[in-house]
Design a protein with these regions (language model features):
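Short phosphate-binding loop-to-helix
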Residues: 25, 31-84, 92-100
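Alpha-helix termini
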Residues: 68-77, 108, 182-188
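Hydrophobic helical membrane-anchoring modules
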Residues: 179, 188, 195-228
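Histidine-centered beta-alpha loop that forms part of the nucleotide-sugar donor binding/catalytic region
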Residues: 49, 87, 118-119
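Short, high-confidence coil segments that cap the C-terminus of an alpha-helix
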Residues: 21, 78-80, 108-111
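N-terminal glycine-rich phosphate-binding loop and ensuing alpha1 helix
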Residues: 1-27
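Conserved core of the sugar-phosphate nucleotidyltransferase
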Residues: 60, 64, 91-185, 195-198
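Alpha-helix/helix-capping structural signal
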Residues: 31, 175-176, 209
Length: 228
């Protein structure tokens, strides 16, 4: 648990309090997540075993879930307008951020998606290294990629702000999932024209050291009384 709640509850609460989300579906093979999700009136999509391995790609699980949801809604004579993709291990999301992303797409029909985005200048590609055949560190990408190397230095901000899609939330139009192969790498489900939904220090939890960061974020930004 994180501050008294299961990790997967935070995105479920955010979704249930958003004024725009009409239905909640959860794709999982986990009985615990299924049980928790039903407390938030979520419909469960049974995730196939081949999509529930460490090697399975998130994009394939999203695509499977999308077509299952589409099938269910078509049987009710309904259509999908937008998909709000949330992640069981990404608690840095609120209903307000979801609403902001939806409103961005409602105002600009040329956008494919709106995703939560955070600045992480300390992890700039300028600082990234790889280990060569001799065991020494080399630039991961050529410095010329960032412009004139003479204008760059050890200041983490010297290359400008570095924005990362932080996996808190991806709000996408259906065509992004219908034709995922046309999307921008590496998160192809976001399409090509992606709007940021600005926030601070968003992340999905992959490592133990991230837990204190997420606890700080929840204490600072999580509003349990918010209704929209």
């Amino acid at each position: 648990p994180i501050l008294g709640k299961k990790l997967c509850e935070y995105p479920l609460i955010a979704a249930s309090k958003s004024k725009y989300i009409e239905r909640i579906f959860v794709s999982t093979d986990c009985p615990i997540i299924s049980k928790i999700s039903k407390n938030y009136n979520a419909s469960i999509i049974k995730r196939p075993a081949k999509l529930a391995t460490h090697e399975a790609l998130g994009e394939d699980a999203f695509r499977h879930g999308y077509f299952e949801i589409k099938r269910i809604l078509e049987s009710e004579n309904k259509k999908i307008k937008l998909m709000v993709l949330l992640f069981a291990n990404a608690p840095t999301i609120t209903n307000k951020l979801i609403n902001e992303g939806v409103e961005i797409l409602k105002k600009n029909s040329s956008l494919d998606s709106a995703v939560t985005t955070s600045i992480y200048n300390m992890w700039s590609p300028l600082r990234a290294r790889k280990i060569d055949g001799e065991g020494t560190l080399k630039p991961f990408v050529p410095f010329e990629t960032f412009g004139d190397p003479k204008t760059l230095n050890c200041d983490r901000d010297s290359q400008g702000d570095v924005w990362y899609a932080d996996m808190g939330c991806s709000i996408v139009r259906p065509h992004c999932l219908e034709r995922m192969e046309t999307g921008l790498l590496p998160q192809k489900w976001m399409g090509q024209k992606i709007s940021p939904v600005y926030q601070e220090a968003g992340c999905d939890i992959d490592y133990e050291w991230q837990v204190p960061v997420v606890e700080w974020w929840i204490k600072k930004y999580w509003d349990v009384t918010a209704k929209e």
